[in-house]
From Swiss-Prot:
One of its GO terms (cellular component) is mitochondrion. Residues 82-92, 138-151 have a biased composition (Low complexity). The gene is Mobp. This is Myelin-associated oligodendrocyte basic protein. Residues 69-170 are annotated as: Disordered. It is found in: Cytoplasm, Perinuclear region.
């Protein structure tokens, strides 16, 4: 819904019929239904939270945020600038909006209790008599075969050594 309104800008499309439910958020005059006639009357305006203004003499009070806005704003009072561009609200809404919750003052965080006492405070549990498991006898390992080349002989001609370094047995 908000995407469609953002695309269309401040005016409603012609196929949407005007009703008092289509109205503006706390903002300056607004044009409905491509009529090019700005609605100045606050009767058709609502606040950001979606509630209508009620007229009390010359003051207009927003039902939701209880802000009072005068038709002729005095220079002493700072003007309420809307954060975003005017947004059209469809009514009746599909889901009823819950009223905004009042902000609760934050209490200091409660330190979390440790789940178990520290090891120094904890008494050691009496353990049952612990016996080491019976040692399994390992099968005797086979002795490794000696290396094929004797360290005394050095590399032979067949093993990549030079023929001059090979021992001479002939």
């Amino acid at each position: 819904m908000s995407q469609k309104v953002a695309k269309e800008g401040p005016r409603l499309s012609k196929n949407q019929k005007f009703s008092e439910h289509f109205s503006i958020h706390c903002c300056p005059p607004f044009t409905f239904l491509n009529s090019k006639r700005e609605i100045v009357d606050r009767k058709y305006s609502i606040c950001k939270s979606g509630c209508f203004y009620q007229k009390k003499e010359e003051d207009w009070i927003c039902c939701a945020c209880q802000k009072t806005s005068r038709r002729a704003t005095s220079p002493q009072k700072p003007k309420h600038q809307p954060a975003a561009s005017p947004v059209v609200v469809r009514a009746p809404p599909a889901k009823p909006k819950s009223p905004p919750r009042p902000a609760k003052p934050r209490s200091p965080p409660i330190p979390a209790k440790p789940r178990s006492p520290s090891r120094t405070e904890r008494q050691p549990r009496p353990r049952p008599e612990v016996r080491p498991p019976p040692a399994k006898q390992k099968p005797p390992q086979k002795s490794k075969q000696p290396a094929r080349s004797s360290p005394l002989r050095g590399p032979g001609t067949s093993r990549g050594g030079s023929p001059t370094r090979a021992p001479r047995f002939w």
